[in-house]
């Protein structure tokens, strides 16, 4: 395991496919990928599970293995370290290139550890990505052992980031169990995602305009929450905005509860089945938020 991690070489190979036909794979060695997992895991554990970040930064929602769209986001927002980034999870599954996607993100995490941040999504969990594509991609292109190494890394990802004490960011949403930020800080890592409770909800819950208070979630996991839950949470914790991902939205971003919550989704033409745009939210020094949109590519006539 004495392989020295040549980050520069790894990043340059991952970026070499810019402008190539979308879908061209980058085949790193298994040792290099294992090295990315181990080194990033070390950094993730050295940083808190609840990140306290400063603006300016750019926030991105689900990527789901759409590697060429991730590259488009960086073309648009600036490649690190030109801008600071926070990603809200769901890097793997469903898309064709989960490996390239997660490898580039982990490489940037290692190289720019204080300016580049990755939260955990519900797909950064073995029981989910075992089913929705990542396991199969690891097995086909490398080994099951490598998939297990990724699991060990994902189990150490942080779950919440608060930007300038005002913007609460997580993958899914709020939890009926969440009364103090200290509860989040007390979650010990490494950890799997449980079937219920605080950590589960932060990664799985959804806002819902028809819910008053807390409701059942059609996903069969966690809850839905209404606008009033958002308002009370923000007031109680002196926050301005909840920023989350986890749901496809047509324009790439969508507000809820009178603009007190925003959903971001950064994978345009999701799975090739939707005509949605992807969006990235830029937060400036004054905490003004603006959106950069990746338009969906016109569907080619078959």
From Swiss-Prot:
UniProt-annotated binding residues for Mn(2+) 2: 90, 122, 171, 246
Gene3D superfamilies, sorted: 3.60.21.10
CDD domains linked: MPP_PP1_PPKL
InterPro entries linked: Calcineurin-like_PHP_ApaH, Metallo-depent_PP-like, PP1_catalytic_subunit, Ser/Thr-sp_prot-phosphatase, STPPase_N
SUPFAM superfamilies named in the record: Metallo-dependent phosphatases
Sequence positions that bind Mn(2+) 1: 62, 64, 90
Family per similarity comment: Belongs to the PPP phosphatase family. PP-1 subfamily.
Protein name: Serine/threonine-protein phosphatase alpha-3 isoform
Organism: Drosophila melanogaster (Fruit fly)
Designated gene of the protein: Pp1-13C
